[in-house]
């Protein structure tokens, strides 16, 4: 009985190590995702506001720099992620712009960054579906 307990503990430790030791991964970008709104033709302003709502709800600071472009910044402790969000009435893209303390090497980045961008993408899709 004791050996089964130790085997279970050892297996749990190995799983935690495997999950916790993920190395850098390729940067996740979203390219030309369709604007899937419930109404036929949302305006550029409506698309921008939906993107802004999605980002703010997830803790991103979303700043419109010009019509069709936003700069998204997420600050979590010492980590900073900055993305360009380009959008039109038909599609949007989320692209890596800059980061701090995420180990970006020109191609790869800390895996948490990818999760944050994937969550932003999901949030944008959800907000756009409400238009």
Enumerate the predicted regions with their spans.
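C-terminal motif of bacterial Sec signal peptides marking the signal peptidase cleavage site
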Residues: 17-20
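Bacterial N-terminal signal peptides that target proteins for export
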Residues: 1-9
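Hydrophobic helical h-region of N-terminal Sec-dependent signal peptides
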Residues: 9-15
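Ser/Thr-rich, low-complexity intrinsically disordered terminal regions
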Residues: 22-131
């Amino acid at each position: 009985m004791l050996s089964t307990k130790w085997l279970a503990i050892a297996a749990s430790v190995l799983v935690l190590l495997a999950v916790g030791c993920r190395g850098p991964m390729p940067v996740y970008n979203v390219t030309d995702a369709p604007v899937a709104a419930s109404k036929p033709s949302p305006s550029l302003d409506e698309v921008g506001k939906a993107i802004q709502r999605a980002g703010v709800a997830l803790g991103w600071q979303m700043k419109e720099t010009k019509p069709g472009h936003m700069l998204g910044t997420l600050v979590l402790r010492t980590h900073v992620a900055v993305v360009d969000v380009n959008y039109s009435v038909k599609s949007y893209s989320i692209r890596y712009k800059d980061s701090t303390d995420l180990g970006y090497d020109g191609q790869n980045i800390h895996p948490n960054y990818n999760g944050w961008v994937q969550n932003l993408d999901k949030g944008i899709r959800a907000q756009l579906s409400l238009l």
